[in-house]
Swiss-Prot record:
Subcellular location: Cell inner membrane
Complex and partners: Interacts with virB9 and virB10.
Organism from which the protein derives: Bartonella quintana (strain Toulouse) (Rochalimaea quintana)
Periplasmic side, ranges: 63-234
Transmembrane segments: 42-62
Side Cytoplasmic, residues: 1-41
Its biological purpose: Component of the type IV secretion system VirB/VirD4 which could be a major virulence determinant for subversion of human endothelial cell (HEC) function.
Family membership: Belongs to the virB8 family.
Disulfide bonding pattern of the chain: none
GO process terms (BP): protein secretion by the type IV secretion system
KW Cell membrane (keyword) present: yes
UniProt-recorded name of the protein: Type IV secretion system protein virB8
Length: 234
C-alpha cells in the first residue's frame, strides 16, 4: 500500500513537471511569435517610409529638371581679329524675338550707312534718314554731303563698298554693337578689306509717318547716336 502511494506521488510529480515544461514551452513560442510579429511590423513601417522617401525624391528631381538644362552653343573665332563670340539659336520667348528684330534693323542700318553703291545711294540715304533721330539725320546729312571730302560720294566715287555683318550684340537695353568688315572693290577688280565696329544708341518711337515710309520702318526703330571705328586686329 505504501509503495503504491509512493508511485502515485512520483507520478503526480512527473505530471506537474511535464505540465510546467509544456507551459514554459508554450510561453516561449508565444513570446517568439510576438517578437516576430513586432519585427514584421517594424520592417513594413520602414518599407513604407523608404517608399515614400523614394517617391518624394523622384518628384523633387522631376520638379528641378526644367531648372537645370544643358544648352549647347557654338563658339566662333574671327580669323582676322582673334575675337571670340558665341553663336546662339533664337529662343521662343518674346524678349528674344524683340532682340532679333532689333538686330535686323541695326544690321540694315549699318549696311546702308557704311556701304556704297551708286545705284542704291538714294534709297540708302532715305533709309538712314527714316531710321535716325532728327539730330542724327543732320549729322548724317552733313557727313554724306558732297561738300565733305570724307563723304562716301567723294571717297568711293566709281567704286563699291560692301558691308558684311560679323556679329551684333547688346551692350545694354538701348545700346548695340555691330562688328563688320567692309570690302571696297575698285573698277579694276582689286579689293581692300577692313574691319570695323559700330555703336548705336537706339529706341522705338511711335512717329507719324506716311504709309510708304512705314513699309521701310514699320516699328519706328530710331538711332539717336552712331559712331564707327576701325577694329583693332590682333
Amino acid at each position: 500500500m505504501k509503495n503504491s502511494l509512493i508511485k502515485i506521488r512520483k507520478s503526480l510529480v512527473k505530471s506537474d513537471a511535464f505540465d510546467e515544461y509544456v507551459k514554459e514551452a508554450r510561453s516561449f513560442d508565444i513570446d517568439r511569435m510576438h517578437s516576430l510579429q513586432q519585427r514584421m511590423r517594424i520592417a513594413m513601417t520602414l518599407t513604407v517610409l523608404f517608399g515614400l522617401m523614394t517617391i518624394a525624391l523622384a518628384l523633387a528631381v522631376a520638379a528641378l529638371t526644367p531648372l537645370k538644362t544643358v544648352e549647347p552653343f557654338v563658339i566662333r573665332v574671327d580669323n582676322s581679329t582673334g575675337i571670340i563670340e558665341t553663336v546662339s539659336a533664337l529662343k521662343e520667348t518674346p524678349n528674344n524675338y524683340d532682340e532679333a528684330i532689333t538686330r535686323y534693323f541695326a544690321g540694315k542700318y549699318v549696311r546702308a550707312r557704311e556701304g556704297f553703291q551708286l545705284s542704291e545711294a538714294e534709297y540708302n540715304f532715305r533709309l538712314i534718314s527714316l531710321l535716325s533721330s532728327p539730330e542724327e539725320q543732320n549729322r548724317f546729312a552733313k557727313w554724306y554731303s558732297g561738300n565733305n571730302p570724307e563723304s562716301p560720294q567723294n571717297i568711293y566715287h566709281n567704286m563699291t563698298a560692301k558691308v558684311t555683318i560679323k556679329s551684333i550684340s547688346f551692350l545694354s537695353k538701348d545700346l548695340i554693337q555691330v562688328r563688320y568688315y567692309k570690302t571696297i572693290r575698285e573698277l579694276n577688280g582689286k579689293e581692300n578689306i577692313s574691319h570695323w565696329v559700330s555703336i548705336l544708341n537706339f529706341s522705338y518711337i511711335n512717329a507719324h509717318i506716311s504709309t510708304e515710309d512705314r513699309l521701310i520702318n514699320p516699328l519706328g526703330f530710331q538711332v539717336s547716336e552712331y559712331r564707327s571705328d576701325p577694329e583693332v586686329i590682333k
